[in-house]
């Protein structure tokens, strides 16, 4: 069987390194290019182990190795154009992933999407590119991977599951003052810091609802979210005739990663026992997760969705640095949305980036104000 070529963008992050774990277990895929931001030592180890020949460095760091090193403002696009890989795993986190996704769609045959912000902020740009190019877009998020596997043309509703985050059992009055150490103890998954905080606020699940609208072309009303404590059911499809499809698996991101790489085939990663299974589904409490319910305000506006993401980036960073309390995160987002509301809808990438930059500035001012009154 002919080897397929793979580029991993954001290789040193959580999804990137777990993709490498999958590559160690499967055959038929050769890693030809990577990008990373600042983790030089890990990048060097990856280049050596996988004999990577092309590296994009997006951070302001010095990097020397046996591979060709691409630098500069268009390095990622230039490498992608030169390699034209069969598969690109977009594991870049944050808003910068939007440019990475568009470059991957332009130059790859399949894009494995692990970046939420690209669809939240630039879904219209992604769908525009998909119409222009003959390229597959396969979701990597466990919830969207699950729905992708069982969805049918006619669905009554889909259900995305949520763990509820580290504070799901805390008294409501104590949540306000939770510390980063409290929040980073996720009950199910092992993830990066920002996404773990976003899980506790359920901003992450708000992103995933918006992603599902884009990926599956579903109206907001057909997407539901339930708290599922066991972390075993990742997606549910409810059909008009009363049938319900669910995807069960251990909470291991290597499962959806491998599926996105090998689709429609599957990797042999292990078995799953049904003997001791217990599952539960609970509604989302608006008092516990106020940021999640901002979805109703932002769902139909890419400008507000972009501002929502920008404000969350700023607020989570401030929380992790001890500048604001946990309860301040949703307040930063709310006040930023108030100031962005009424902005014209973006029509291209540059306008999305302008809104994101402006929203970040607003959120930073709100954060400074909150910090000053709480200190």
Swiss-Prot record:
Keyword match Manganese: yes
Entry keywords, A to Z: Isoprene biosynthesis, Manganese, Metal-binding, NADP, Oxidoreductase
PANTHER family referenced in this protein's UniProt entry, alphabetically: 1-DEOXY-D-XYLULOSE 5-PHOSPHATE REDUCTOISOMERASE, 1-DEOXY-D-XYLULOSE 5-PHOSPHATE REDUCTOISOMERASE, CHLOROPLASTIC
GO biological process, one term: isopentenyl diphosphate biosynthetic process, methylerythritol 4-phosphate pathway involved in terpenoid biosynthetic process
A GO molecular-function annotation: manganese ion binding
Catalytic reaction annotation: 2-C-methyl-D-erythritol 4-phosphate + NADP(+) = 1-deoxy-D-xylulose 5-phosphate + NADPH + H(+)
Gene behind this protein: dxr
Taxonomic lineage: Bacteria, Thermotogati, Thermotogota, Thermotogae, Thermotogales
Record protein name field: 1-deoxy-D-xylulose 5-phosphate reductoisomerase
Organism: Thermotoga neapolitana (strain ATCC 49049 / DSM 4359 / NBRC 107923 / NS-E)
NCBIfam families reported for this sequence: Dxr
UniProt entry tagged with the keyword Magnesium: no
Binding-site positions, Mn(2+): 141, 143, 208
Similarity comment: family membership: Belongs to the DXR family.
Amino acids binding 1-deoxy-D-xylulose 5-phosphate: 116, 142-143, 163, 186, 199, 204-205, 208
Residues at which NADPH binds: 12-15, 39, 115, 117, 192
């Amino acid at each position: 069987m002919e080897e397929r070529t793979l580029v991993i963008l954001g290789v040193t992050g959580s999804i990137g390194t777990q993709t490498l774990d999958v590559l160690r277990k499967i055959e038929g895929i050769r890693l030809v290019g990577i990008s990373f931001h600042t983790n030089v030592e890990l990048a060097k180890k990856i280049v050596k182990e996988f004999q990577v020949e092309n590296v994009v460095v997006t951070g302001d760091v010095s990097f020397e190795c046996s591979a060709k090193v691409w630098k500069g403002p268009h390095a990622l696009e230039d490498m992608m154009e030169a390699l034209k890989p069969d598969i690109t795993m977009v594991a870049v986190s944050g808003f910068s992933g939007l440019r990475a996704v568009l470059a991957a769609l332009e130059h790859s045959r399949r894009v494995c999407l692990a970046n939420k912000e690209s669809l939240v902020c630039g879904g219209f740009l992604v769908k525009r590119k998909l119409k222009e190019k003959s390229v597959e877009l396969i979701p990597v998020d466990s919830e969207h991977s699950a729905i992708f596997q069982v969805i049918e043309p006619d669905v009554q509703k889909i259900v995305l599951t949520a763990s509820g985050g580290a504070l799901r059992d805390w008294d409501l009055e104590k949540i306000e003052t939770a510390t980063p150490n409290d929040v980073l103890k996720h009950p199910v998954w092992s993830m990066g810091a920002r996404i773990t905080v976003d899980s506790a606020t359920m901003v992450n699940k708000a992103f995933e609802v918006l992603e599902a609208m884009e990926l599956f072309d579903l109206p907001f009303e057909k997407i539901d979210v339930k708290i599922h404590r066991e972390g075993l059911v990742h997606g549910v499809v409810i059909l008009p005739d009363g049938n319900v499809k669910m995807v069960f698996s251990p909470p291991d991101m290597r499962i959806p990663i491998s599926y996105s790489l090998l689709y429609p085939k599957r990797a042999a990663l292990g078995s799953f026992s049904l003997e001791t299974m217990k599952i539960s589904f609970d509604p989302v409490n608006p008092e516990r997760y106020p940021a999640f319910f901002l979805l109703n305000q932002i769902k139909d506006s890419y400008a507000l969705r972009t501002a929502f993401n920008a404000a969350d980036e700023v607020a989570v960073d401030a929380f992790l640095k001890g500048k604001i309390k946990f309860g301040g995160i949703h307040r930063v987002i709310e006040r930023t949305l108030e100031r962005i509301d009424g902005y014209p809808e973006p029509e291209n990438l540059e306008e999305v980036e302008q809104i994101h930059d402006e929203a970040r500035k607003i959120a930073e001012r709100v954060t400074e104000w909150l910090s000053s009154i709480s200190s």
